[in-house]
């Protein structure tokens, strides 16, 4: 089957069986300021297959996107059935692709690696429950949990990196989470760093970003994050990797 054929088949199957409505990848109910809303992840046109169910999709570049879809994507707020807010999400993904990517069906690398070459493998994958993208949480520690993590890329090897989007104390409209130092650009962190921030009880928070030796890293990198009334802020710090148990030394520090 040609790439175009696979794309059309996947899009048709998904829309017919799992999409809440045509082009709506996912919708979730949420309460904002006492009002019930429906938030939708909506494609502008039928999405194409991305990292389709094959063995190669279990490799590092596809981690978090395996068995997914790509296209032009927006996040939309509906109240009483009427659109009240919209944010274009494609702009936050790779400029080279100019497309947003979302995982559609979950991958199981341990089991899938041995089954990926079987003829009915793709059919079995598409019977799995869809991955829930909008998993709301309180990342800025100032809102009612109306933000969610959105993977926008991967880093070697297969580290999920992305942004958090939604509504925070900074603005009542849809927006990406930024920092006080750089309010004009989305804050990009690894998924485990966003999760640590969401679950943290005290500020500041020191998170290991890249350990010594990770893919040849000659320094150890930490992310220091603090939050308060002015929003989220912090720094990225690099330390030496001394031998023999000697203490690490700070060699570089940049604001987030």
Task: Mark where each language-model region is.
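A glycine-rich, hydrophobic loop/mini-helix early in the fold
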Residues: 82-138
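Hydrophobic h-region of N-terminal signal peptides that target proteins for export
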Residues: 7-17
